[in-house]
Amino acid sequence: MIELYFIFNGHRRYYLGNFIQAQDAIDALKAHQKTSSAINNPRFRKSMSGNAIRIDYGAVDCYYLITISKEKEKEQND
């Protein structure tokens, strides 16, 4: 399972949901950005670290974080 969070003010997390497919998480991310941001022309950039993907879209202190849930990590290690 993929978990999607919106990080604002540099550290506060807002949970956006669990997703099975990465494309579903990306679609939810884009829909949230479109309805919740004043940035009309976002420029998405990703950076990866371990099992986390950070997606910046142009805001100074806000970004999206995609992680693999703990349950999925356990299944992969077994």
Across the structure, where does each feature detected by a protein language model lie?
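Short aromatic-glycine-(Arg/Gly/Cys) micro-motifs in beta-strand/loop hairpins
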Residues: 1-15
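N-terminal processing/targeting junctions
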Residues: 12, 25-26
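Local beta-strand/beta-hairpin segments that build beta-sheet-rich folds
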Residues: 15-16, 61
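Conserved aromatic
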Residues: 16-22
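A short local loop/turn or secondary-structure capping micro-motif enriched for an aromatic residue
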Residues: 23-25, 63
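Residue-level detector of alpha-helical secondary structure
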Residues: 26, 30-33
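Short, mixed-charge low-complexity intrinsically disordered segments
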Residues: 34-78
